[in-house]
């Protein structure tokens, strides 16, 4: 399946390890961009009824998902894991199997570690994977670029958040599109 064949009824969001204790290794501007896009994704995916599952890496040491994201997350499944590859965690796999969707959209941290390992495993399991380039991050630009390049070379589709959302909505004459425009304006105002 080409990424252009995706639709709200065949995708699932996986949010990987967006935890505040990881933020000090990232540039503040990168954290703000990624957080803004993750919040946009969560709000829109809830609006158009796309299921979401998430992970938190080693909560005992790294704490929980960033508070604003966690508040918006609601009661979607969230797995505490210690394995870098999310697919190596049995509870994560159980959550993934609850939603039999062929396309997995990926956001979170860090691009070259947990995100990369998870994407490679999902591809081996015959999922189509869409990595949102502006909703993943690493401690350095080089590591981020390496992670993105590695995922693309192995078959993941690399998009940005806005491209994906507009593609899913298809048209401008819906309440969902009006909601997206409102969210994009709020996002732009918060960044300026």
Residue positions per predicted region:
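Active-site loop/turn elements of alpha/beta-hydrolase fold enzymes
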Residues: 18, 57, 134
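Active-site-adjacent betaalpha module
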Residues: 2-12, 48, 60-192
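Short, contiguous strand/loop micro-motifs
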Residues: 27-29, 53-54, 105-106, 134-135
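Short beta-strand segments at enzyme active-site cores
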Residues: 15, 52-57
């Amino acid at each position: 399946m080409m990424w252009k064949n995706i639709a709200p009824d065949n995708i699932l969001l996986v949010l990987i390890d967006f935890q505040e204790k990881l933020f000090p290794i990232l540039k503040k501007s990168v954290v703000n961009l990624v957080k803004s896009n993750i919040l946009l994704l969560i709000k829109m995916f809830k609006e158009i009824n796309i299921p979401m599952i998430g992970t938190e890496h080693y909560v005992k040491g790294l704490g929980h998902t960033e508070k604003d994201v966690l508040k918006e997350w609601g009661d979607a499944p969230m797995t505490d894991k210690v394995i870098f590859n999310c697919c190596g965690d049995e509870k994560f796999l159980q959550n993934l199997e609850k939603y039999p969707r062929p396309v997995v959209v990926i956001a979170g941290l860090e691009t070259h570690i947990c995100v990369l390992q998870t994407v490679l495993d999902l591809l081996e399991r015959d999922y189509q994977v869409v990595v949102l380039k502006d909703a993943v991050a690493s401690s350095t630009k080089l590591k981020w670029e390496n992670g993105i390049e590695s995922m693309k070379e192995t078959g993941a589709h690399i998009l940005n958040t806005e491209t994906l959302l507009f593609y899913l909505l298809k048209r401008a004459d819906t309440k969902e599109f009006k909601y997206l425009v409102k969210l994009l304006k709020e996002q732009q105002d918060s960044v300026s």
